[in-house]
Structures are given as structure tokens and as C-alpha cells.
Amino acid sequence: KYWLLFYLARSPCRDLCQKNLHLMRQIHIALGKNSAQEKYALVQVAHSKDRIKNEHRQQDPHLLNYFISDKEFHKFFSVSRFKQSAEGYYLVDPLGRIILYYPPHARGEAIYQDLSHLLAHLTTG
């Protein structure tokens, strides 16, 4: 079981999205030995024709890359406590619960500090 930090964005992944993918990679590296407990992903809301584009995986083999439809996107927000169209970072615990949200312009240091603290101090059974 692992923690998942994912970035939710509309496809295609443009400048801000690219910057935030780089930031997630840097956070993962900065976690050091605790990085084995964390994975990171890009979740893109895409039309089916966009699903074949998977260039991010080639640039970063550790990045998990998922595509969801508009319908899946709307369903996600209908059952979550987050605002519709909330592009940004989401932190999921090992039990599959979304516990934190960070806006797209969040500071990497804040995300790193929260994640580092959780990995160092919390265990789930």
C-alpha cells in the first residue's frame, strides 16, 4: 500500500500542468527513503482521441498516467467534497481516501512538508 499524489488537469497538459508534473517529481525525489511509500500520477480529463497521447510516461517512467472521460470527471466531483473543475493536486491515503487538496499554484514546499510528515508519522492497518 502506498500514498498517491496526483495532479488533475484537463487534457492536453499545458504549461502549468507541465510545471506541476516537474514539481511532483521533485517532491518524490526529495522524500528520499520514504519515496517507496509514495507514487505520483497525472489524471487527465480527455476525449477518447486524446487518450492515445502518453508522452509524459516517456519523459518520466515513474509517473502514472490516467485518462478519465468528462462523465467520470463529473461523477468524481458529484461524490466528493471538492469544487467542480478543481484542477490541482490531490493526496490519497493508502486506504483510497482523498485527504488533502492543493490548488494548481500551491508551493511545492507545503506539499512536501505535509507528505513527508504523513509518511514519517502515520501508519495505516
What is each residue range found by the language model?
Residues 85-86, 91-125:
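Thiol-/selenol-based redox modules, centered on thioredoxin-like
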Residues 27-30, 79, 117:
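A generic secondary-structure signal
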Residues 1-24:
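Short active-site neighborhood of thiol/selenol oxidoreductases, capturing the structured segment around
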Residues 8-11, 43-46, 103:
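Structural motif
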Residues 7, 40-42, 91:
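Structural beta-sheet core signal
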Residues 21-42:
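Conserved helix-turn-beta segment immediately C-terminal to the redox Cys motif
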Residues 1-4, 19, 33-36, 114-115, ...:
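Non-globular targeting/processing and membrane-anchoring segments
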Residues 39-41, 47-87:
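Short, internal strand/loop/helix patches
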